[in-house]
């Protein structure tokens, strides 16, 4: 059996080594070398920010390989002072030769007014938000993410989920921002009633 645990702290973390499918870590995952019940490996990294992205701070990246399963449960980050994100029930696996990350995200809203300002949401639709829970699936090779099963303040809304299920984020950051803002505002309007 192989047991190891690595902990580290840095000012900035470069996530391209973890999420770019051509980098060494994703390539190792594709070999399925970690699908071994004798490997028990934990990697925990804390960072003040993400390289080339000043919006996200206080990153805690926790990864674990145990019993041939790979997850990033309890990984966290903050979007400025607006919201905190926490990942749970995650699993990284290979499907048809592609690396997939499935999981759940809990978003704790710190300042909903700042989020509404960022989204340019009309004032008459701005309701106070506390938490958002949702499922997600990220394909490392296609650089795409889909969202599902959204609950706002522990309430499931069919209309919001129909809108959120339309969200598929691709690699183009500018297009994603505009597309995401428009769809999120559509969901907020539905939530506001």
PLM feature segments, named:
Residues 1-193:
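Membrane-proximal interfacial segments on either side of biological membranes
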């Amino acid at each position: 059996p192989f047991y190891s645990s690595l902990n580290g702290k840095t000012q900035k973390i470069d996530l391209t080594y973890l999420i770019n499918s051509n980098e060494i870590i994703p390539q190792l995952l594709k070999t399925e070398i970690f699908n071994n019940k004798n490997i028990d490996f934990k990697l925990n990294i804390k960072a003040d920010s993400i390289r080339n992205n000043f919006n996200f701070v206080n990153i805690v990246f926790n990864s674990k390989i145990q019993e041939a399963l790979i997850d990033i449960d309890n990984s966290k980050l903050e979007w400025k002072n607006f919201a905190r994100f926490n990942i749970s029930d995650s699993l990284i696996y290979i499907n048809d030769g592609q690396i997939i990350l499935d999981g759940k995200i809990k978003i704790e809203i710190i300042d909903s007014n700042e989020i509404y300002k960022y989204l340019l949401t009309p004032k008459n639709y701005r309701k106070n938000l506390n938490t958002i829970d949702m499922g997600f699936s990220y394909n490392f090779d296609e650089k795409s993410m889909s969202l599902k099963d959204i609950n706002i303040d522990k309430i499931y809304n069919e209309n919001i989920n129909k809108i959120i299920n339309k969200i598929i984020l691709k690699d183009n950051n500018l297009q994603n921002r505009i597309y995401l803002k428009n769809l999120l505002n559509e969901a907020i309007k539905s939530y506001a009633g």
